[in-house]
């Protein structure tokens, strides 16, 4: 049996929105391209599977669970359970939440496994699958059936079957045929499961849940044997356990009180027991120690999964938040230990089918042996008839006959053993009809063979010998070898199948790697292509930049020369009176400087594309207007016209502006500066604004993409809910249509019956009138008789009696007729009621169809919305890619633009003081904003540092408490070791003294007399015994000191747990210290920068304004900081409220969908019950038709009376069986005590009972009776009688079954409510039967006295449900009723009904 380790997977959930808002750090990370997890700084763990925060449900299922589903179909038991702290994603991973409102991509392990299982079942048509489902909850260490809530917790018990597998007795197992039924049962169980709300989780599981799928496979063996017999089918039984554990909780974090606190205690105790089991199984040093499975019920249920015969996968769910560091570390440690657990999975073949196959093969061999023996007998008879003179041949044949007779006797013994085994198997194991039929045929065949053998032996006088050729022996040997070869071949086939599976897995992995390589190659080609295009564009842009720089230098030279000419004219310069032409001010002003022969310059600076958003244009225009306002304030007016047209219109405007620049000169005020220089300034500003606009575009597109993705998820969820509701509606519509058909059928039957009744009503009315007339006539005659004076008084009394009898009969007849008339009216109204119900059902079906049409319409609309959203998302993704590519190119040009800005600034410094002043103002504003942000960031870091310090203090206090407890245990260990050292010292000194005394005694023995020698030898023996005991003690003490086992195992375990907890807390403290140090460093640097910045602020403010303005500005600065901080906190609070609102909305939506689901389920159940009711009504109407409508109410009454009588009889039989068992136990105990001698009680090795054995025998006798044997059907009793007639040797085990089956006792005793017999002869026969049965019982009890020496007695226990507690008053009444004489008891109703039949036969 091959051992395999438990597979362990770790799944790290992403940070929650609440954790991200509070800036929780990520302390658990996945090492890329490996199956390793790192927690904190340097703690690395390796597992079988590792899933990061971006892993999907499909990935988890395909990697971990799919192989388990394949193993389940192969016949192995499988288990998957999720382990981790509360709120780490266990229920989400397993899939135990509300399934109807979950989209396809977010479904957990259980729904996917259910689909996979039924898909595999559909792929194997040659195998009959029987699927059962159970759902158990462990709540407060009590078992609870989630599929049958009415089942009491006391009726559910954990037991072990004959193979050692853990089973739950009393749990409901539902047969299912499809995945939809399983999903509905799972949904029903999830709705009944205990969940609650804590501070860490809105939907916290308050119990452990185990969802089990049991599959029984029956392989159809279509190959027949050579002689035409069929082998029994092959049975395989396997189970899949899906375990959703409740998370470990800390009261300080969850804030549980009251009932939630009690639940937390039970949850933590169960998880502690599970952790102890994992530690015991995973620690190689503790393999020989006891495994504490019985410490909790969840560990008992997981016994097969941890160290048993199942294939197990443990999924450890971990929170990455730094606030849960210690919990995550402990979970990873337990998961690492679980990797050392090894299971021994086996295929679960049904033992009954294997036994039947073996017996059928043995029967086949015996049949062949009998045929060969019969052939040998015929040959020997032929030889005897021929009278061959060869005496040597006769002697050899006689020897062969003797040998064959010995073999025949052996075969007969085998047949008898097989026969008794089959009879026992038939009584103990429930067989189906096919197997029972086979057994009965085999019984008949054995009986026929025995008869044929007897007749053949009688025919030849019982002296004929058997002969068999040597070929038969060789055939049997060859068949045995063939059987061995078949077993070896089957084992080889299993190995080959395993190898084939491994080869398939390797092929799949190779294919996956090839596909990944292809994908990487394609992505590499695309990246190379993009890189080549980018290089080409960069080269083109570099060339353009060089050309533009050359032309810009030329243009600057021409501008400076023209400016000198204009400024040097003085008063001769003419100032035009009209307004100058305006220059368009757009995003790229570099084009509006005329370049005569460069049309390719548009490739560098192009206008934004047509698909840019309007809001981006609006923002751009507002910023441009703000720039214009600043320029007008400085008396440098530059009016610009904005073009909102398309790209063509913009290009036309650019060409026109270029011609204006060529044809006209710029007209300025006398003290103004040249406007072309200002154009270069605006050009730089617009280039910067372009980059900002591109970033804004990307942010807007990403936000819109997130919104569209959210809408897409909502539409998918609505689609799944609508599809689920449509499926349920179709099921309900179909069921209601079937119910309508049943109602129509019932209505037709009721109409036909009502027609019959209408005829009978008229007849009954006629009979009623006639009866009334007869009644009136009899009353008149009675009055006449009373008025007449008859001489004979006796005659008068006789006539009065006769008339009164007639009157009573007539009244009774009238009452019966009136009742029949009422019943006929009710039956006639039945068809009308059915028509009404059918109309109501048709209306509900129409309403459901209308709902279905609406849902279909909604589905179409949602599909269209989904397609539109997909298109929008693809378009936004394409835009983002293009903008990112464009911004990447522009970022490559930033150094050139910065160089140009530097040149422009150097050129403008001398003459443009006002522009410098504006730039200084902007810089000061930016600087103030940066200072405010620095202060805010510093305060936020301070708050985070304070929170980390508080957490570290809590961890340190916890560590100190653990250290105190550890120091207490270590001191105890030290004191114990010191005590052991002193003990060992005392023992050694005492041993030295004893050795001295022994040496002295030995010297005295040599010199003393005989009497003294005996005394001294006795003293020496005493001293030697004391020495041996002291040596043993010293050896034990030395062993304890050597191994360090000073404390008890519990204290050692507690010390081990404390060391682990301290280690985890030290790691958490180390992690906290590291984060605190980093924060302190950043805070010191920020403090230094802030102090320097504050000094700069004060200096600049002192230079700009007086002291009062400076103080006001400083106060304003603090006020702004406080307001920004309050704004941040309010924003954080608003985000939390939004998240809570979203959670509440999701909860409301889930509850509404669950309510709709439950309504449809209730409607479905109600429809099913109505359908069953209508079928029963049809059966009654059919029965009524067969009886022609007479006595229907009488049959109802008789049935009800019979049911009541049977219930009374059942109660009586239970009571009498208990009394008989008690009496039987007492009588058997007395008989055993009388027959067994006292000397026999002390013998232990001869198979005779000890006193303890007597007690055990009485206990076995207590449970020996089997009431089920009294409830056998007639066919089974015939089989038992035929089987018992075939037996040649008495079976001692059957004696126990014969004891409770004492028909005279039960036939003589009857319940008090039984019918009294009218004949006295019957009572006499009953008395005689009772005396016979009493004598028979005493003889049987004497036989039972010797049963104590029999072996192999199998006690059969009654079910606990058959026992109930009775009151003292009821007990006294029963004892008083038992004290009554047996002859006065009434006969049982069943026996009364049987006696006339027995008399007839």
Swiss-Prot record:
Q: Which PROSITE patterns match?
A: KINESIN_MOTOR_1, KINESIN_MOTOR_2
GO BP field: cilium assembly; epithelial cilium movement involved in extracellular fluid movement; establishment of localization in cell; microtubule-based movement; ventricular system development
Detail the disulphide connectivity of this chain as listed in its UniProt entry: none
Q: Which residue ranges does the record assign to the Kinesin motor domain?
A: 5-341
Phosphoserine carried by residues? 643, 646, 672, 675, 704, 999, 1367, 1389
Q: Which SUPFAM superfamilies match?
A: P-loop containing nucleoside triphosphate hydrolases (SSF52540)
Record has DNA-binding as a keyword: no
Chief localisation class: cytoplasm
Residues covered by region (Disordered): 643-662, 1259-1332
The UniProt entry, under InterPro entries, shows: Kinesin-like_fam, Kinesin_motor_CS, Kinesin_motor_dom, Kinesin_motor_dom_sf, P-loop_NTPase
Pfam families reported in the protein's UniProt record: Kinesin
Keywords of the record, alphabetical order, are:
ATP-binding, Cell projection, Cilium, Cilium biogenesis/degradation, Coiled coil, Cytoplasm, Cytoskeleton, Microtubule, Motor protein, Nucleotide-binding, Phosphoprotein
State the Gene Ontology terms under molecular function: ATP binding; ATP hydrolysis activity; microtubule binding; microtubule motor activity
Task: Kindly list any coiled-coil regions of this protein.
Answer: 352-413, 489-557, 705-886, 916-1070, 1118-1154, 1190-1219
Compositional bias of type Polar residues: which residue ranges? 1281-1292
Q: What does this protein do?
A: Plays an essential role in motile ciliogenesis.
> Quaternary state and partners of this protein?
Interacts with STK36.
- Return the similarity comment: Belongs to the TRAFAC class myosin-kinesin ATPase superfamily. Kinesin family. KIF27 subfamily.
Q: List the protein's name.
A: Kinesin-like protein KIF27
List the source organism. Homo sapiens
The primary gene name is: KIF27
